[in-house]
Amino acid sequence: MEHPWIPNSHKAILDEMLEAIGVSSVDDLYRDIPPTILLSPEEWDSLPIGEGRPLSEAEVLARINDILSRNKYFTDPPPFVGGGVWPRYVPSVVKALITRGEFLTAYTPYQAEISQGLMQALFEYQSLVAELLEMEVVNASLYDWSSAVGEAMLMARRVTRRNRVLVPETMNPLHLETATTYAYGGGIRVEKVRVDRETGFIDLEDLESRLSQGDTAALYMEYPSSYTGVIDENVEAAGEAVHKAGGLFILGVEPVSMAILKPPGRLGADIAVGDGQPLGLGLNYGGPYLGVFAVRWDGRLVRQMPGRLIGMTVDAEGRRAFAMILQTREQHIRRAKATSNITTNEALMAIAAAVYLSLLGPQGLREVAEASWYMSHYAAKRLSELRGVEAPLLEGEFIMDFTVRLPMDAGVARRRLLEKGVLAGIPLGGFSFFSDNDMLLTVTEAHTRRHVDLLVNLLDSVLGG
């Protein structure tokens, strides 16, 4: 019955644990699990173990390399896929520094007296992001963009004591799905606002109509949109409208583009959220990424912020010191009444972002943003030269992401490009007002003109040009 892969599977140990929790058998413990998918203890011995013999280190490494060789890598060209995370060049120094033993942990530095280096690095992250976004208070990280939106909605409800949040109908569906899950638990209704079909801008008339109902806790928008790339020119007017209605303005931003766009602090945002992935984190399945969360200087907002805050102070001997501050908001003190349930977090990713921002500086970050703008516009221009292709589909200004209409099903085109070794686009069929022929394409500073020309030529052949 004992199995080398299953801890505590020896009968004597199992019996002792079952007795301690007041359960008569393993079957009784798992009675809520459908029997068709349950592996009984009698079947444990049938689980295969490797090669039936111990393997040497060299053999194990060979097996792992064989498995890894089945993966497909997209480095030349990088993927033309964004939608909330983007292909970016990650300087080697970022990984070199965050893999140092002093930093390599995701755990919260509760013991300030032995964590000064880690805390200072997190304080620097907060300071750098505050400067980039022109927001006064930044926390030490949330999980990702989606969780940051969800936490912002919950925070808006606590501050305003209202339970409705408005979002544009073209809000990133992945962000919306997670945020709606957060909102449901907090008793918040999420309502979509119409977006202009030609420009991709939020419809101010529809927004005003919904705000007139008087129960809006917040309006959430993205600048630029992470699922259309559009830089909404109505963003300031929308923020003023929600403030006039007594709600908060939550703005989701892509951090690199803030080097050339007006930051949320100057757009009237009460809360700014986003993902730190473009700041030196690269792409890796679902993460780990970095939820950015910032607020303007307002006691009501700061006291209701989720997540850790690192502050600078002086110790008993007058020396500069760093510590976690305003901890009475947090679950290790307030338990169920805490402003969030995040403890162990993305601190290591925050340090990576701090390294990236420090390395590039304001001018370097601006150059990355300008290169992304240039390359995405070059790609849209080249694609528009193909017969039957409309690029960009929306008239609003864009950066990195842009929508394209093809003369064929976008999903089919994507599969055929993949067969040619290029991962390109997110089909938009079924999303908002887009058709099956519409696709979201992404081009950043990681792409070159050669990469774009390759994409255009391959797409031309896929379209039968």
UniProtKB/Swiss-Prot annotation:
UniProt GO BP: glycine decarboxylation via glycine cleavage system; nucleoside metabolic process
MF (Gene Ontology): glycine dehydrogenase (decarboxylating) activity
Any single Pfam family the record assigns to this protein: GDC-P
InterPro entries linked: GcvPA, GDC-P_N, GDC_P, PyrdxlP-dep_Trfase, PyrdxlP-dep_Trfase_major, PyrdxlP-dep_Trfase_small
Name of the top EC class for this enzyme: oxidoreductase
Documented EC number(s): 1.4.4.2
Catalytic activity, reaction form: N(6)-[(R)-lipoyl]-L-lysyl-[glycine-cleavage complex H protein] + glycine + H(+) = N(6)-[(R)-S(8)-aminomethyldihydrolipoyl]-L-lysyl-[glycine-cleavage complex H protein] + CO2
Function: The glycine cleavage system catalyzes the degradation of glycine. The P protein binds the alpha-amino group of glycine through its pyridoxal phosphate cofactor; CO(2) is released and the remaining methylamine moiety is then transferred to the lipoamide cofactor of the H protein.
Subunit structure as annotated in this protein's UniProt entry: The glycine cleavage system is composed of four proteins: P, T, L and H. In this organism, the P 'protein' is a heterodimer of two subunits.
Family named by the database record: Belongs to the GcvP family. N-terminal subunit subfamily.
Protein name: Probable glycine dehydrogenase (decarboxylating) subunit 1
Source organism: Aeropyrum pernix (strain ATCC 700893 / DSM 11879 / JCM 9820 / NBRC 100138 / K1)
